[in-house]
């Protein structure tokens, strides 16, 4: 059992873990939940050129400790929506909601996730940002059991960046930018 501690002191002593390229530190990993401290800015350019979203079957809880963040989601598989989470606010993201956290410089947040059940599958989706689609259009989807998001995402993203044909939208033919 972890004894109570000052979160502000922890942040002051571990601030280097909350900047690119790491940005993320697992503060607690128990039987049922994982609690991560996340800093900004994001080091990838997902939000602007390529719409990449993670789909987790379980809920995620966001609490914005310092500064504001933006959570880009796909709502009901029909609409892109941006949710602003301001400093001091919290938000519970329902399971199976495609999302992309956009973190800005000098921000700190907490994210709590349930441990994934053994039969749970996460999805990494890339959406077309070039065509004039009536609803969010998936270009590519990778499905995997998430054991360690930090190590599992990198090869999937690198494959996307290298393989131009995998970035071609089946609906409009546009090729998405690699980053």
Curated annotation (Swiss-Prot):
Subcellular location field: Cytoplasm
Q: Which UniProt keywords apply?
A: Cytoplasm, Dioxygenase, Iron, Metal-binding, Oxidoreductase, Pyridine nucleotide biosynthesis
What InterPro entries does the entry give?
A: 3hydroanth_dOase (IPR010329), RmlC-like_jellyroll (IPR014710), RmlC_Cupin_sf (IPR011051)
Q: Which Pfam families match?
A: 3-HAO
> Coiled-coil region(s) at which residues?
none
Record-listed substrate binding positions = 60, 103, 113
List residues binding O2. Answer: 44
Q: Name the protein family.
A: Belongs to the 3-HAO family.
This one is known as: 3-hydroxyanthranilate 3,4-dioxygenase 2
């Amino acid at each position: 059992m972890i004894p109570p501690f000052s979160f502000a002191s922890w942040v002051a002593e571990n601030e280097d873990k909350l900047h690119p390229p790491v940005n993320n530190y697992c503060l607690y990993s128990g039987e049922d939940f994982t609690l991560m401290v996340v800093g900004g800015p994001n080091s990838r350019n997902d939000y602007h050129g390529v719409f990449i979203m993670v789909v987790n079957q379980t809920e995620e809880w966001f609490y914005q400790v310092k500064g504001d963040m933006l959570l880009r989601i796909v709502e009901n598989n029909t609409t892109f929506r941006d949710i602003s989470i301001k400093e001091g606010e919290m938000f519970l993201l329902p399971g199976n909601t495609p999302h992309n956290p956009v973190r800005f410089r000098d921000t700190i947040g907490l994210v709590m996730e349930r441990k994934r059940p053994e039969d749970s599958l996460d999805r990494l989706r890339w959406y077309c940002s070039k065509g004039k689609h009536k609803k969010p259009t998936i270009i590519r989807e990778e499905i995997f059991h998430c054991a360690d998001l930090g190590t599992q995402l990198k090869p999937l993203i690198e494959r996307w960046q290298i393989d131009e044909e995998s970035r071609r939208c089946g609906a409009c033919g546009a090729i998405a930018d690699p980053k």
